[in-house]
Amino acid sequence: MSRNQQLFEQSQTLIPGGVNSPVRAFGSVGGTPVFFKRGLGARLWDEDGKEYIDYVGSWGPMILGHAQPDVIAAVQATAANSLSFGAPTALELEMAQLITQLVPSMEQVRLVSSGTEATMSAIRLARGFTSRSKILKFEGCYHGHADSLLVKAGSGALTFGQPSSAGVPPELAAHTLTLPYNDVQALEHLFEELGKEIACVILEPVAGNMNLVRPTPEFLGALRSLCTHSGTLLIFDEVMTGFRVALGGAQQLFGIKPDLTTLGKVIGGGLPVGAFGGRADVMAFLAPLGPVYQAGTLSGNPVAVAAGLATLKQLQRPGFHEELALKTRQLTDGLARAARDAGVTFSAQSVGGMFGLYFSAECPASFAEVMQSDKQAFNRFFHGMLEAGVYLAPSAFEAGFVSIAHSEADISQTIVSAQGVFSRINDQ
């Protein structure tokens, strides 16, 4: 029995499902989860000593790669002065200054400890500011595990939400409306019927939790126009896209200005952190200035903020995001070419340093189209690549991530490995 198998068996006796976040259990792809012990650059090593090229990147934060020297030095220097104060620090001011400089729509910002906290707090703020209860999200978009966001779409455009998790009261879920991603007609219909009752619309401006789905320009434009007309706040959940698809996030890339933005992942450099911010008149409703309460013992934790600052400073290097996007396109183009040569139905696309792999003829534009891809083929591909030393997201419904630490040799090795795996897929 491998060390990974031993650890997973032991973990299942003490930790529900053996993991502290469900996707890590390999439930979607089957098999034993990999237990990692070390990372450096674009590489990971598991408890059995096996080496992998990493395309998960801790689900997005590791944009510089693992154990980046400047980030490690910042963490060590800050930790030497204390791990936490529970009081204001100069570091959190520096972080707020940098975020508002890089993302101009965020006129003010509040630091929290996770992406879930950020989205949960932004929605509460939107409800407090507008004095409305309903919110709109899109099918297949994930915004953390707050109760009101664990809702899936019904069959009709105006169907009120039904809980997609036990423990979420139906009466709470009823305030959450859902629509298909990229469906402008359904969006216009909903706002015609209920626009004046909707506090906010929250969306991933590049969906990354139903694999990767790009927004259409018409969809984003309609969202901004309808929200402005109805007095509804537009929230961009940039926990995943923030500072990754462009220095100013997806809103810079697509030229759409939201009212509120949520951040996480990259701004912690690998440590737990989140943030939300936006229009100053909206942020003024937050306590201690306003009636909307939000607090946190570890909010603005100095060690996490130091790691985030060190990361963001690296991202400001001229050409950083162009280089990252090029590496990612080289990966997806190479994988698509390898699949085509092997006669495997496959498509791939990328946005900045994010990418999506689909066992379907075309890249999907909605959750329904994502669901039509061949998930069994993906599972075979995942395990073949894992055996070859390439670590991809263990689910057909998750985006992948490239770091600036990935070399041409890493990408070439990945494509060569994929050629062998693709050649075997149709035989299985």
UniProtKB/Swiss-Prot annotation:
One of its GO terms (biological process) is protoporphyrinogen IX biosynthetic process. Pfam families: Aminotran_3. It catalyses: (S)-4-amino-5-oxopentanoate = 5-aminolevulinate. Gene3D superfamilies: Aspartate Aminotransferase, domain 1 (3.90.1150.10), Type I PLP-dependent aspartate aminotransferase-like (Major domain) (3.40.640.10). The modification N6-(pyridoxal phosphate)lysine is found at residue 265. Its main location: cytoplasm. It is found in: Cytoplasm. Keywords: Cytoplasm, Isomerase, Porphyrin biosynthesis, Pyridoxal phosphate. One of its GO terms (molecular function) is glutamate-1-semialdehyde 2,1-aminomutase activity. Its cofactor is pyridoxal 5'-phosphate. Pathway: Porphyrin-containing compound metabolism; protoporphyrin-IX biosynthesis; 5-aminolevulinate from L-glutamyl-tRNA(Glu): step 2/2. Its EC number is 5.4.3.8. It is an enzyme of class 5 (isomerase). GO terms for cellular component: cytoplasm. Homodimer. Belongs to the class-III pyridoxal-phosphate-dependent aminotransferase family. HemL subfamily. This is Glutamate-1-semialdehyde 2,1-aminomutase. It comes from Methylobacillus flagellatus (strain ATCC 51484 / DSM 6875 / VKM B-1610 / KT). The gene is hemL.
